Design a protein with these regions (language model features):
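Conserved coil-to-alpha-helix start sites within the AMP-binding
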Residues: 31-40, 196-197
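Short hydrophobic alpha-helices that are characteristic scaffold elements of the AMP-binding
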Residues: 47-48
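N-terminal loops that bind phosphate or other acidic moieties
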Residues: 127-475
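Short, acidic Gly/Pro/Ser/Thr-rich loop/turn segments
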Residues: 15-17, 87-89, 115-116, 194-198, ...
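C-terminal helix-cap and adjacent tail motif
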Residues: 79-127
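A glycine-rich helix N-cap at a beta->alpha junction
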Residues: 1, 69-94, 270-271, 275, ...
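Glycine/small-residue-rich phosphate/adenosyl-binding loop
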Residues: 1-35
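GST superfamily/GST-like fold recognition
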Residues: 30, 51-63
């Protein structure tokens, strides 16, 4: 910045023009927007003359106004650094550094009404169907190369155990050997409330969901501590919290509805609401991957959501609810018995059909479960590994597999929860957990602890020498 020949500060004056000035009176924000468009014109003109323009964003607006002696009422729209450059890169530096990727136009264009996705001149497309179409199995060529490389690395065959399986999976998923190291990573915590809470299945009041969302955003939860330890981003998404949450930096407001209905008296959700929540998960996966993340982790928050998880797992494992319904937040025997009875009552009432995954979610699922289904499908369609957390993620994975069986190519079981339903889900999915610490918290905590293990599995493929390159004699 200091070496740039010319620095330009562009401001907008919101006090200019009276109520008859077109655009200013009814839409005050048009003033800085118009100034930003003027900056774009300047940028294009400078580029045509061989000049580079850097748009600086790391400054405090009020501090800059005072430092430059600007009138206090001015809004700083842009701080630009202008000068000749040695050469222009083929693509923006943010993309080169992996900080940002250009999104396909089809991701963001809606026709006539929001949610009706269509490019000009093309028929509308369904986001879920489009996503499922792009989910493919592991690449056989890269998978074979990974196993061959494992044989040549300076270690006894099979010495790295599960890490060898994970590294081969990452290779097949990415179609590359060695595979990309899955960093940076982001944990997506979907928050939603449950109408079945009214049946007395947990000792915690429903407002704890919103309070914990605030805790996540304030950096005070266990998931924040673990994320800080492993260098992961925490992304919090309100997909169905019962109350209105204040606008807070870091919170993505994607509420489909204010909590589910009581699944013992009727469907928890409509089919349309299920699809909307799945789309929230798909779009979250797309946004996080477009932002440069190489791995996605599942997280959730919702008081009473283990009741819905037990119902989903019972449906997809064909297991007695008594065997897959756990104690969640540590309920006593009496409440545990009631919780089992509630799950049985809901399943008897709805008789959900496993062949209709949307219908199963509508009957007994949660908004965060549906959103996690979308995250898994979205991650798999982008060939990005998704590390699963606990019992709720296991339930979501069962539903996602019913929608698109090849989704499991992208799934890695981060840990085994203390919840009995999680064991049943993992067995049905055929996934082996990487960590077993009797965790039963959720929030993505188990997935976060597993992240360094997954990253290590990829790193050894890059950094461990082969017998030939190291000059080590084989057995």
């Amino acid at each position: 910045i200091l070496d740039t020949p010319v620095n330009i500060v562009v401001t907008a004056d919101p006090t200019r023009g009276g109520r008859h000035t077109l655009g200013r009176h009814t839409q005050p924000q048009m003033a800085p927007y118009s100034s930003a468009l003027a900056v774009e014109n300047l940028w294009l003109a400078a580029r045509a003359e061989g000049l580079g323009v850097g748009w600086v964003s790391f400054f405090d607006e009020r501090e800059m106004v005072r430092a430059l002696g600007l009138p206090e009422h001015l809004e700083v729209v842009a701080y630009l650094c202008v000068g000749y450059v040695d050469e222009f890169p083929d693509e923006p530096e943010l993309m080169q550094a992996g900080w940002s990727k250009r999104r396909p136009l089809s991701w963001v264009v809606h026709e006539e009404t929001y949610g009706r996705r269509a490019l000009p001149g093309e028929d509308p497309h369904d986001l879920l169907a489009e996503t499922v179409t792009n989910i493919r199995p592991l690449d056989a060529k890269a998978l074979g190369e990974a196993w061959e490389r494992q044989k040549r690395m300076t270690k006894p065959p099979g010495a790295l155990g599960m890490l060898e399986i994970i590294s081969a999976q990452l290779s097949g998923l990415s179609r590359m050997c060695p595979p990309p190291i899955p960093e940076p990573a982001a944990v997506a915590i979907f928050a939603g409330d449950h109408g079945v809470h009214a049946q007395g299945v947990t000792a915690w009041p429903q407002e704890v969901t919103a309070q914990m969302v605030a805790n996540f955003l304030g950096g005070g939860a266990v998931c924040n501590a673990f994320a800080n330890q492993v260098g992961a981003e925490v992304c919090v998404i309100d997909v169905g919290v019962a109350c209105e949450l204040p606008a807070t930096p870091g919170l993505l407001p994607r509420k489909v509805r204010a909590g589910t209905a009581d699944m013992t008296t009727g469907p928890a959700l409509t089919r349309e609401e299920v699809k909307a929540a799945i789309e929230v998960g798909i779009e979250t996966a797309r946004d996080l991957v477009a932002a440069g993340n190489k791995a996605l982790l599942t997280g959730e928050m919702g008081i009473a959501n283990t009741t819905a998880s037990a119902a989903l797992i019972s449906v997809y494992t064909d297991t007695d609810p008594a065997e897959v319904t756990g104690r969640g937040t540590g309920i006593n025997d009496e409440m545990h018995t009631r919780k089992i009875e509630v799950v049985c009552r809901a399943l008897d009432f709805h008789q959900p059909d496993p062949a209709d995954p949307i219908g199963v979610l509508a009957a007994v699922g949660g908004l965060e479960h549906a959103a996690m289904v979308g995250l898994l499908l979205g991650g798999a369609s982008l060939r990005t590994p998704v590390i699963l957390d606990g019992v709720s993620a296991g339930a979501a994975a069962l539903v996602a597999r019913a929608i698109a069986p090849e989704v499991l190519a992208a799934c890695i079981a981060g840990h085994r929860s203390a919840e009995p339903g999680h064991v049943a889900a993992l067995n049905k999915l055929g996934l082996r957990p990487l960590v077993d610490l009797d965790l039963r918290l959720g929030e993505g905590t188990g997935a976060l602890l597993a992240l360094p293990v997954v990253q290590s599995a990829a790193r050894v493929m890059h950094e461990v020498a082969t017998f030939d390159s190291a000059g080590v004699t084989e057995k």
